[in-house]
């Protein structure tokens, strides 16, 4: 495959926009008086436009993948169901129009970077994404202490999920023997912010990514496990000192994983389920209550994408959303069976996506899904080229 200079500049420009989005979003998260909106919204709008452009310009053969077809069907079904609500509510302000346009943001961002990955080798541009990962970590690290002194609001620390979401692509850019280092940085960031969902995701990644045998690694399993534990001991010490100085009590929070911890998740989940299963007729079960209803009903996100889509759009969209993750897992299994180079990294992206969808927000909000969409799109593009014997010249 021959990549033109124009293609390369388009891809580089996209990665620069991605870097700007992540850095500005994390900075915004620690500015307590910041109003909604900003240049990151412009970047989101650009990714939507780029994704729509890719929809009409990618050959059908390149999008004939179960993940892409399922994802496309899910997001555009949601978009179509949201349209009447937005049209007939009479509230057609700029904010409403923007949120309506960005409903399929995750899919369009994924499709755009899939298109870029088809035309370019993802390893050539590591110098753009790796610094973004490090800069985002530094911003998070330096701003957290002052943030806790400025406000009692803890929501902004969820920006750590941008760091966790970038891990799959960072693993690709890191030599195998050093991949534990960005993972440890992500661990430190998650422990500092006190995000238990992030901790569970990283624990799962540790078990499924680092512990299983690598075909190229001839070291016995016990040696690999001991080496990882040796690295984790000083990391535990650093994290303990940091969380102690920030008064985060992270390990107390981990000991209470079954409790709510102040986020209101359990009460929101109970309220949504009770309303859908006991207080409704059959019609809301099938088609939901309409775009944004769950957010208005409980005064915020449900912190579970499955329940929020169920409340807003009904059982049909819930099934489509579940089928999206089923297709991702199936594709990951195919990659493992084919011994695809980036199968493990694709698995990491799926793990992060599943945990965000279950305990935070993923496709329901155009924020954390950005990094996961980039990783899934780029790796799936490499998978397409692997299956079709396509190489770059």
Enumerate the predicted regions with their spans.
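Aromatic-anchored transmembrane helix interface
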Residues: 40-49, 67-86, 90-115, 128, ...
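Long extracytoplasmic/lumenal interhelical loops at the membrane interface
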Residues: 259-313, 334
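N-terminal signal-anchor transmembrane segment
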Residues: 1-59, 78-90, 102, 138-154
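Alpha-helical transmembrane segments of multi-pass inner-membrane proteins
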Residues: 48-51, 105-147, 154-213
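Hydrophobic transmembrane alpha-helices and their immediate junctions
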Residues: 7-8, 60, 315-354, 386
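Hydrophobic alpha-helical segments of polytopic membrane proteins
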Residues: 2-3, 14-16, 168-241, 319, ...
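Transmembrane alpha-helices of multi-pass inner-membrane enzymes
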Residues: 346-354, 363-393
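Flexible juxtamembrane loops connecting transmembrane helices in multi-pass membrane enzymes
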Residues: 221, 236-271, 293-296
């Amino acid at each position: 495959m021959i990549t033109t200079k124009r293609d390369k500049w388009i891809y580089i420009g996209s990665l620069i926009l991605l870097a700007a989005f992540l850095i500005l979003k994390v900075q915004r998260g620690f500015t307590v008086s910041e109003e909604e909106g900003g240049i990151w919204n412009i970047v989101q709008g650009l990714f939507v436009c780029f994704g729509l452009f890719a929809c009409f310009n990618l050959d059908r053969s390149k999008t004939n993948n179960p993940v892409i077809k399922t994802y496309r069907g899910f997001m555009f079904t949601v978009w179509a169901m949201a349209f009447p609500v937005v049209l007939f509510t009479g509230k057609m302000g700029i904010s409403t129009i923007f949120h309506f346009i960005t409903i399929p943001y995750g899919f369009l961002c994924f499709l755009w970077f899939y298109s870029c990955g088809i035309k370019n080798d993802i390893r050539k541009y590591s110098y753009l994404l790796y610094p973004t990962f490090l800069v985002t970590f530094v911003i998070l690290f330096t701003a957290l202490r002052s943030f806790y002194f400025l406000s009692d609001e803890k929501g902004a620390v969820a920006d750590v999920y941008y760091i966790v979401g970038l891990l799959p692509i960072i693993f690709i850019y890191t030599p195998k023997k050093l991949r534990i280092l960005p993972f440890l940085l992500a661990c430190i960031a998650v422990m500092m912010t006190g995000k238990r969902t992030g901790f569970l995701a990283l624990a799962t990644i540790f078990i499924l990514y680092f512990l299983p045998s690598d075909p190229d690694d001839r070291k016995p399993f016990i040696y690999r496990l001991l080496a990882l534990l040796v690295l984790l001991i000083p990391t535990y010490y650093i994290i303990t000192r940091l969380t102690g100085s920030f008064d985060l009590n992270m390990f107390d929070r981990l000991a209470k994983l079954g409790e709510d911890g102040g986020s209101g998740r359990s009460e929101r989940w109970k309220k949504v389920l009770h309303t859908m299963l006991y207080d409704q007729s059959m019609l809301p079960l099938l088609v939901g209550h309409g775009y944004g209803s769950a957010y208005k009903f409980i005064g915020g996100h449900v912190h579970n994408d499955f329940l929020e889509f169920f409340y807003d759009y009904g059982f049909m969209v819930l099934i489509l959303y579940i089928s999206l993750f089923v297709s991702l897992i199936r594709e990951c299994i195919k990659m493992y069976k084919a011994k695809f180079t980036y199968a493990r990294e694709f698995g990491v992206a799926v793990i992060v996506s599943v945990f965000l969808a279950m305990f935070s927000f993923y496709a329901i909000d155009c924020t954390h899904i950005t990094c996961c969409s980039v990783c899934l799109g780029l790796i799936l593009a490499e998978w397409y080229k692997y299956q079709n014997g396509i190489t770059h010249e």
